[in-house]
């Protein structure tokens, strides 16, 4: 499904369609697209915090859509993202507690 979402975003970038929300985002540019990514990411956090599975699914879908648009707009392919994920798979993380911040 992510590939389909990405391909649809790519198609709309190459073939703008009047009245299309995706075309509108591309027309407004990267700042507008990134603003929407930020809004949707925040809504995912709120849905998770509220323990609302339905809202979590809906907001995650919105975030993935806007991320696909952002990837296309910045020229990053889904294959590039997948390559990064593949390279990270199986690597041991250096997880440790960070020191408490006591001065702001």
UniProtKB/Swiss-Prot annotation:
Chemical reaction(s) catalysed: 1-(5-phospho-beta-D-ribosyl)-ATP + H2O = 1-(5-phospho-beta-D-ribosyl)-5'-AMP + diphosphate + H(+)
- Main subcellular localization, coarse class? cytoplasm
Task: Cite the entry's keywords alphabetically.
Answer: Amino-acid biosynthesis, ATP-binding, Cytoplasm, Histidine biosynthesis, Hydrolase, Nucleotide-binding
Give the EC number(s) listed in the UniProt record.
Answer: 3.6.1.31
Pathway field of the UniProt record reads: Amino-acid biosynthesis; L-histidine biosynthesis; L-histidine from 5-phospho-alpha-D-ribose 1-diphosphate: step 2/9
One of the GO BP terms on file: L-histidine biosynthetic process
The GO terms this record gives for MF are: ATP binding; phosphoribosyl-ATP diphosphatase activity
GO terms under cellular component: cytoplasm
Compartments, record wording? Cytoplasm
Question: Which protein family is it in?
Answer: Belongs to the PRA-PH family.
* NCBIfam families for the chain: histidine_hisI
User: What name does the UniProt record give this protein?
Assistant: Phosphoribosyl-ATP pyrophosphatase
Gene behind this chain? Answer: hisE
């Amino acid at each position: 499904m992510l590939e389909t979402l990405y391909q649809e975003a790519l198609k709309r970038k190459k073939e703008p369609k009047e009245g299309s929300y995706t075309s509108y985002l591309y027309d407004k540019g990267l700042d507008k697209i990134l603003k929407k990514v930020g809004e949707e990411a925040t809504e995912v956090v709120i849905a998770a915090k509220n323990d609302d599975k339905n809202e979590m699914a809906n907001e995650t879908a919105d975030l993935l859509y806007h991320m696909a648009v952002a990837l296309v707009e910045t020229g990053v392919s889904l294959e590039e993202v997948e390559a990064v994920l593949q390279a990270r798979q199986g690597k041991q993380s250096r997880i440790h507690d960070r020191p408490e911040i006591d001065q702001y």
